[in-house]
């Protein structure tokens, strides 16, 4: 179970708003590239260019990479969002904590699923599911736990 307060982490949306509000980024571009090699794992690279000239010469100010298991219909979107957030953090938009809220949500999600992978019986999985539900785990996590049964 996660031992951190998600409200202490900026969302990628908040970082993007700060980025675009900065006048020096008025000509910037945020480009995402799919580097996935198979259907099991999404791998996304984000490149931030501050000017058209930087993009034309392929000189990004910064990059960010993220990966996400292709576990549901929204895995690609989460991966792209995380990649953008990492690129912004690698530049100057990390806020008070470097990881984005979305990245920390992934950690929280992984805690339950990782724990499920180490259990050996259906009864243990049922107990874990009940704990996750009692702790307000997302529907996505609960559905992921069901896959272990």
Predicted regions located by residue number:
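Polyanion-binding surfaces on beta-sheet-dominated domains and ring/shell assemblies
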Residues: 1-119, 123, 147
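Short, polar loop/linker segments at the starts of domains and inter-domain junctions
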Residues: 79, 128-129
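Solenoid-repeat scaffolds in large eukaryotic assemblies
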Residues: 124-128, 141-142
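Repeat-associated, polar segments at repeat-unit boundaries in modular proteins
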Residues: 135-149
